[in-house]
Amino acid sequence: MNVILLDKIANLGNLGDQVAVKAGYARNFLLPQGKAVVANTANTEVFEARRAELEAKLVADLTAANERAEKINALESIVIASKAGDEGKLFGSIGNRDIADAVTAAGVELAKSEVRLPLGALRTTGEFEVEVQVHTEVKAIVKLSVVAED
């Protein structure tokens, strides 16, 4: 199924690209989310008429994401206290939600889906640098300090 992308989508294309995708992906994800329209003559004409508006929206989203990333990078080290054993091993773990809640409490809104922990949840005390993907093109780093609770 051919679709016209209304947004930049990782591993697929940019705004305005006409791409061939599987019908299920288009019907179940791209079309309901408003990220694409079916590529036919009528939709192509409508898209070309709205292209400038969509590009301006994309630029505005990118600018807002850059501003959020700067705020996140400007944060001091965020401290999360958790119960831990004598050797620094946590009873439990620090996951995406815990990190997102701590950053939000520090004053910058952050969703748990934006936090990237490629090695899984944090299970020891110490200093960590956690990557946050604010936008498909914008990433930020959060300095995190996990300490043992008294």
From Swiss-Prot:
UniProt-listed InterPro entries: Ribosomal_bL9, Ribosomal_bL9/RNase_H1_N, Ribosomal_bL9_bac/chp, Ribosomal_bL9_C, Ribosomal_bL9_C_sf, Ribosomal_bL9_N, Ribosomal_bL9_N_sf
GO-annotated biological processes: translation
SUPFAM superfamilies per UniProt: L9 N-domain-like, Ribosomal protein L9 C-domain
CC terms in the record's Gene Ontology section: ribonucleoprotein complex; ribosome
Domain of life per record: Bacteria
Gene3D superfamilies: Ribosomal protein L9, C-terminal domain, Ribosomal protein L9, N-terminal domain
Recorded family membership: Belongs to the bacterial ribosomal protein bL9 family.
Function of the molecule: Binds to the 23S rRNA.
Protein name: Large ribosomal subunit protein bL9
Lineage, broadest ranks: Bacteria, Pseudomonadati, Pseudomonadota, Gammaproteobacteria, Alteromonadales
